[in-house]
Amino acid sequence: ERRSWTAALCCCMGWALTAAPAGAAPASLTLDVPDLGEPVGIAADLSEGRYWVTDGTTSGRTTVVSVGDDGKLGTKLNWQAPTTDVQALSWYDEHLYVGDIGDSARRRDHIQVLSPMSLNGGSASWMAWDFSYPDGPHDAAAMAVSPRGNMYFITRGDKPAIYRTRSNPSRTGVNALIKVADAPAGVTDATFLADGSRIAMRTDNAIHVVDAYSWHTIGAANFTDGGGEAMTTDLRQANLELTTSATKVTTAQIPSKVEKIAAVPTASSDHTASQKPTAATEPDSSRSTSKRPVGTVAAIIGAVVLAVVAGVFVGLWGRREDA
């Protein structure tokens, strides 16, 4: 009987060791979409288990495609909305949001966000909202929608900052945005994480995670795996998916501690070493009850500890049996 208990314990130990890597980031994704340029926006569709992608080229400005978790083309969505510079996609409450927010010349008196009313493919009607910055035109490439439905825009260029919409924006007029914090330089995309209280932001060389209440940086990690601009969560919201070329999407873990970010060797003021966001006014006040994902490292450490304890236990049990 004692040998049976020992065998069972060893089996549990073996299961823990083999199960631990399951928390690791899944394999990278290859986008198999003909004529797709380098994506500027990607959003995880948590309802249907797919990703929406747009490349921001002339044709891409009126086309968004979906791909499965195998990278294969699914739905091609067209709509007739006039746009200026589509730069971002976001997903919230079973709706896709398209950020027409680019303004490299800083000449637009307002930006717009579109939301197709159907995601079944083909042509679609859309909803649209117009927004203006309180301090003049800005170029932006990043948009994220909070669990409360507030839209956040992260500008780039001189004095990069984070702005958000007021609750229930009008669809018949131009809505004034609120500046909530300074932002890291050169942000190209952003997404809310599963708990709804953190925003992940991507730059040319790093991933930053900020608390959406205090606007303090709570995680930062270097990321230099190729080029690319777009970022979203994976379909489990446990990791991040970052585009690194027209066809490649690389998985990265969500930073949980602040690393020193290496400076990008460029003369552009948009892409200098990142700065920490600083709080301004009115952070989003909604907090999701979703559980935060457990990291791979924690799973491995737990398995190792279990293995050590099991080894000691088996050794002591064996000694008792021999005595």
Residue ranges and their predicted role:
Residues G23-A323:
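Sequence/structural signature of beta-propeller domains
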Residues A7-T18:
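Bacterial N-terminal signal peptides
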Residues E1-R2:
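N-terminal secretory signal peptides that target proteins for export/translocation
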